[in-house]
Amino acid sequence: MATYSVHVKWGKEKFDNVEVNTAEPPELFQAQLFALSGVPIQRQKIMGKGKTLKNDSWDGFTLKDGMTLLMMGSNELVPTPQLGTKFIEDMSSTELNKASSFPAGLTNLGNTCYMNATIQCLKNVPELKQALERYDGKLNIGSIMSMPSDAITISLRDLYNVMNKTSAAVPPIMFLQVLHAVFPHFAEKSEQGGFMQQDANECWTQLIRMLQQRLPPLKTDSDSNLHKSSFIDQYFGISFKTVLKCDETDLEAETTLTEHFYQLSCFISQDIKYLNSGLKSRLKETITKASPVLGKDALYTKSSLISRLPAYLTIQFVRFFYKEKEKVNAKILKDIKFPMTLDVFELCSSELQEKLKPMRDKFKEEEDKRANEKLLQISIAANNKKLPFEFSDDIGSNNSGYYELSAVLTHRGRSSSSGHYVAWIRKQEGLDEWLMCDDDNVYAVTSEDILKLSGGGDWHCAYVLLYSPKSLIVADEKNDHH
């Protein structure tokens, strides 16, 4: 058993230095070729020195470093034979996806719904997909452990590329292998030998952390642009202005610091019924820490306000807590309502609120204008333009405090390490069209279905929310000659 570097010829194309590990099943090698060529595994025929590779074994198939293998197979969608009218209820999920141009689903490879749901939600950020497309490099199996963030970034890029080429369900074999290599605890197996269910939000935060290390920041010609070290910091980074005041002595001066996060947390308590109040309740809390003045642990009031908003706001409902007796992350099922349009103005510092006001005024002007046009039945100009959602000196920020719900990651079950995770995504920005991505099945759903994900029972229950910047579309006066 060994690792080899081979070349693969496919028609007029040639893939150089593809790594093959014969300790892994051939399907993993085929998944790499699928990522490179788009040829589904079941259509691949791989030959070397007069032998054809079997799907389940390397037996009789000899490899050497630098040898060239021949692959045959088409990456084009097979035309559906004309069998007359086929009704929706008779269609398979793949046929339905193809018929309605739905995005590709992801095959569940054994309790991998936590990963599939995370991948589908993050795919709903167009700027992230573009940043991944700009990222160079090929996956090198041998260097996964020395460059884990590089391997995660490349394998996610390649997976999205494959998903964009098809409407059939995609088996994310290569990405799962990399995820397991980088985070071995995600590869834990049950007594029955299958993969154990994992926490989807942990998968989400680990992917964001890996991408943060690799995706470079976008740059402009302006010297005034606030410097961020990564694309993730620009588009997902939240900054808090935090003040710590000791409750037990007036001799200790207040401490002001800036904290950075990629998620907001909505803690769930008996009196919390709405997302906004859950977020607001954590802005002021009492903590215990060492007091340099008193020389002992003391109580402090920690007051936090948002000083920088990202374009994409991620919010986690803290629904799981550890039950010592059962040794399980048990779930809080409480119903917490969340809105389609979120306004976080009240959570922001006074300095940020002042910066947000000009764009908020424009939103108000446009709403009033459209209300009057509707009242007077005047047609709204067709020549519309979208105003920037970010401050000119801060790429990837939000300049209004207004957000639109883009994706919901849900959990159904009673603990984070069991049950089932699903992604619910807005099909297109600004449109009230939603999709439920349940592993390989993708279904059309309504906004009413989305709002029913607030919890309170054994139905799918919101665990992570992804909000995108609410766009302001105005008439382009340069083109408007009315």
Which role fits each region the language model picked out?
Residues 1-482:
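UBL (ubiquitin/ubiquitin-like) substrate-recognition surfaces
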